[in-house]
Amino acid sequence: MKRFKLAMITALVAAMGALAANADTIGYVNYKTVESNYEFAKNAYKELDAEYLNLQQYLMDKEKQYKNIESPIQRKNFEETVQKDFKVKNDNFTKLKMKKAEEVENNIVNAAKAVAAEKKIDVVLDYRVIFTGGTDLTDDVIYYLNNNKKFKKNK
C-alpha cells in the first residue's frame, strides 16, 4: 500500500511538472502607454486635430458669410449648400479618423505579436487584467514601433 501511494505521488508530481512545462508564458502591454509614445500615432492624432480645426474654421467662416446675407431666400439656399458641404467634409473627417485609428491599432497589435514571438511569449494581455506575474512588453513594443527593430535588448 505504501508503494502504491508513493507511486501515485510520484506520478502526480511528474504530471504537475509536465503541465508546468507546457503552460503558456504570459506577457502584457499597457496599450495607452504604447499609443502615447508611438511616433506614428502622435503624428496621426496631430493630423486629425488639424483637420478638426479646419472643420471648425470652415463653420466660423460660413457663419460670417451667413450674417452678411440679407435675403431670406439666399439665406435658405446658403444654409442648404453649407449643410451639404459640411456633411461631405465631416464624413471625410470621420473616415480619416477611423482609418488612422485602425492603422495605429493594427501596428501596435502586430508589434506586440512580433515582440512576443521574439521573446517566446505565448499570450499577450492588456496590463489591466494582470494582477501579478507575467512579462511587461510595453517598452519593447514601443521600441519596436519607433525604431523598426525586432525588440529592445534585455538590460
Language-model segments: what does each one mean?
Residues 1-8:
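Bacterial N-terminal signal peptides that target proteins for export
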Residues 9-17:
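Bacterial N-terminal signal peptides
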Residues 17-23:
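Sec/Tat signal peptide C-region and signal peptidase I cleavage site
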Residues 24-131, 148-155:
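Amphipathic alpha-helical segments
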Residues 138:
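Short beta-strand-centered segments that line the small-molecule binding cleft or hinge
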